[in-house]
Amino acid sequence: MTEYFWAFTRAFIVTVIFMPAVIKFLKQSKEQAVIRKLGPDHQSKAGTPSMGGALFIAAASLSALIGSVAYSGKIGFVMVLIPILAVVAYAIIGGIDDALKMIHHADDGFRFIPKLLAQTLCAVVIMIIMWIMQIPLILNIPFIGVFNLGIFYFIFLWFWLVGWSNATNLTDGLDGLLTGTSLIVYLVYTWIALGVHNHIIVIFNASIIGALVGFLLFNKPKAKIFMGDTGSLALGAGLAIESIVLGIPFSLLWFGLIFVIETLSVVIQTIGYHFWKKRIFPMAPIHHSFEKFGWNEWQIDALFWIVTAIIGIIGILYMS
């Protein structure tokens, strides 16, 4: 229990201490200025620095590594390697994407195909490490059964990592929205990991949560800094990989329901406009529709956080 506390504290302190310096550095660099063109109120956010995810992901990863090694030595190092690799790899992809946006002063950084190839490469590396570590490549499908997919497990792993990293990326459209919702989902999986005595995942999650709590102090409305794709892609990849490690990947469809809804709203909006030239929602992702209805960011954040918390509690009670 002590190591859980220190994992949280280390990540929190590092994030809180160094974030002001990061914000100052990014503001002084004209290349780092970000102008969001999405959302009804995007103009008021012009000039807010991005890539805050780089610091809190680094803080969380370092804290998780220290905590895991302190808890169980080499075994802890090996066990925490996969979740750390997942968040760091996708943070790097997001970081390149953010950097390209800033350099070109555009909404799009990585083009679709190169970005997908980079995400696929990361999934391949993670899959190889899982195979080397002899992690069972089985898929537990609720109400159906357990299947040993063998090499075909890669297809599922690829889909899960790419899908969830992009789902959280779509959710990161308002100050504090993704920070708060993902924090709650990580809390839920921390509770589950405690129940199955997976102490390394608990340490990893405690580190992520500590970093997110620290980041939220700067990311709450009105945000002083955004996490950027650096943070949003990494958070989704982290949730995807730990749901797999815990052996309950499909639970994320419930606990991460907000991310699913955000993604579906974009898909539905795109299909509706493509086939019928009509917008199904006032704006997508769906959190922007609430802005169109006159809600402020705090109200939308509160709604999404509360819904995520209720979903988490219901899920935990059901699994108990």
Curated annotation (Swiss-Prot):
<protein>
    <recommendedName>
        <fullName>Phospho-N-acetylmuramoyl-pentapeptide-transferase</fullName>
        <ecNumber>2.7.8.13</ecNumber>
    </recommendedName>
</protein>
<keyword id="KW-0812">Transmembrane</keyword>
<dbReference type="GO" id="GO:0008360">
    <property type="term" value="P:regulation of cell shape"/>
</dbReference>
<keyword id="KW-0472">Membrane</keyword>
<dbReference type="InterPro" id="IPR003524">
    <property type="entry name" value="PNAcMuramoyl-5peptid_Trfase"/>
</dbReference>
<keyword id="KW-0132">Cell division</keyword>
<feature type="transmembrane region" description="Helical">
    <location>
        <begin position="300"/>
        <end position="320"/>
    </location>
</feature>
<feature type="transmembrane region" description="Helical">
    <location>
        <begin position="176"/>
        <end position="196"/>
    </location>
</feature>
<keyword id="KW-0573">Peptidoglycan synthesis</keyword>
<feature type="transmembrane region" description="Helical">
    <location>
        <begin position="198"/>
        <end position="218"/>
    </location>
</feature>
<dbReference type="InterPro" id="IPR000715">
    <property type="entry name" value="Glycosyl_transferase_4"/>
</dbReference>
<dbReference type="Pfam" id="PF00953">
    <property type="entry name" value="Glycos_transf_4"/>
</dbReference>
<comment type="pathway">
    <text>Cell wall biogenesis; peptidoglycan biosynthesis.</text>
</comment>
<dbReference type="InterPro" id="IPR018480">
    <property type="entry name" value="PNAcMuramoyl-5peptid_Trfase_CS"/>
</dbReference>
<keyword id="KW-0961">Cell wall biogenesis/degradation</keyword>
<feature type="transmembrane region" description="Helical">
    <location>
        <begin position="241"/>
        <end position="261"/>
    </location>
</feature>
<keyword id="KW-1133">Transmembrane helix</keyword>
<feature type="transmembrane region" description="Helical">
    <location>
        <begin position="51"/>
        <end position="71"/>
    </location>
</feature>
<keyword id="KW-0133">Cell shape</keyword>
<keyword id="KW-0479">Metal-binding</keyword>
<dbReference type="GO" id="GO:0071555">
    <property type="term" value="P:cell wall organization"/>
</dbReference>
<keyword id="KW-0460">Magnesium</keyword>
<comment type="similarity">
    <text>Belongs to the glycosyltransferase 4 family. MraY subfamily.</text>
</comment>
<dbReference type="Pfam" id="PF10555">
    <property type="entry name" value="MraY_sig1"/>
</dbReference>
<dbReference type="GO" id="GO:0005886">
    <property type="term" value="C:plasma membrane"/>
</dbReference>
<feature type="transmembrane region" description="Helical">
    <location>
        <begin position="143"/>
        <end position="163"/>
    </location>
</feature>
<keyword id="KW-0131">Cell cycle</keyword>
<dbReference type="GO" id="GO:0008963">
    <property type="term" value="F:phospho-N-acetylmuramoyl-pentapeptide-transferase activity"/>
</dbReference>
<feature type="transmembrane region" description="Helical">
    <location>
        <begin position="75"/>
        <end position="95"/>
    </location>
</feature>
<comment type="function">
    <text>Catalyzes the initial step of the lipid cycle reactions in the biosynthesis of the cell wall peptidoglycan: transfers peptidoglycan precursor phospho-MurNAc-pentapeptide from UDP-MurNAc-pentapeptide onto the lipid carrier undecaprenyl phosphate, yielding undecaprenyl-pyrophosphoryl-MurNAc-pentapeptide, known as lipid I.</text>
</comment>
<dbReference type="GO" id="GO:0046872">
    <property type="term" value="F:metal ion binding"/>
</dbReference>
<keyword id="KW-1003">Cell membrane</keyword>
<feature type="transmembrane region" description="Helical">
    <location>
        <begin position="5"/>
        <end position="25"/>
    </location>
</feature>
<keyword id="KW-0808">Transferase</keyword>
<dbReference type="GO" id="GO:0051301">
    <property type="term" value="P:cell division"/>
</dbReference>
<dbReference type="GO" id="GO:0009252">
    <property type="term" value="P:peptidoglycan biosynthetic process"/>
</dbReference>
<feature type="transmembrane region" description="Helical">
    <location>
        <begin position="121"/>
        <end position="141"/>
    </location>
</feature>
